[in-house]
């Protein structure tokens, strides 16, 4: 009689293991399961995110015809994806500073407060970083006036 019960119990055990290790098993109710290798939220405090942000803003300033530097007012969203390096996806609000492009240090530049010089932009950047090679590439950049 043990023989007829063995097959259903084995199938039940396999099903239980499959459900326990599926990607949906660790997700919270109401949230879609996170895919392995898919984009995930990242903190702006992470060193890699900070470097990617600085790089993207630097590239934005190089490509801009504006005589003033811009810098991040706010990071609206930061995500990262582990691939053969790291893809960073940053949604950033940029503001025009009082520093011209001839000034090297933009960290202490205040934002313009005069209405005719004040300018904001909302940008989405995708940065590909390979930290062990020390390389970063701006893969995608879209900006619009805010």
UniProtKB/Swiss-Prot annotation:
Q: Which InterPro entries match?
A: Cystatin_dom, Cystatin_sf, Prot_inh_cystat_CS
Disulfide bridge map: 99-109, 123-143
One of the record's GO molecular function terms: endopeptidase inhibitor activity
Q: Which residues carry this modification: Phosphoserine?
A: 43
Instruction: State which tissues express it.
Output: Expressed in submandibular and sublingual saliva but not in parotid saliva (at protein level). Expressed in various body fluids, such as the cerebrospinal fluid and plasma. Expressed in highest levels in the epididymis, vas deferens, brain, thymus, and ovary and the lowest in the submandibular gland.
Which PANTHER family does this entry report, sorted A to Z? Answer: CYSTATIN, CYSTATIN-C
Listed under subunit, the entry gives:
Homodimer.
Which protein are we looking at?
Cystatin-C
Gene assigned in the entry: CST3
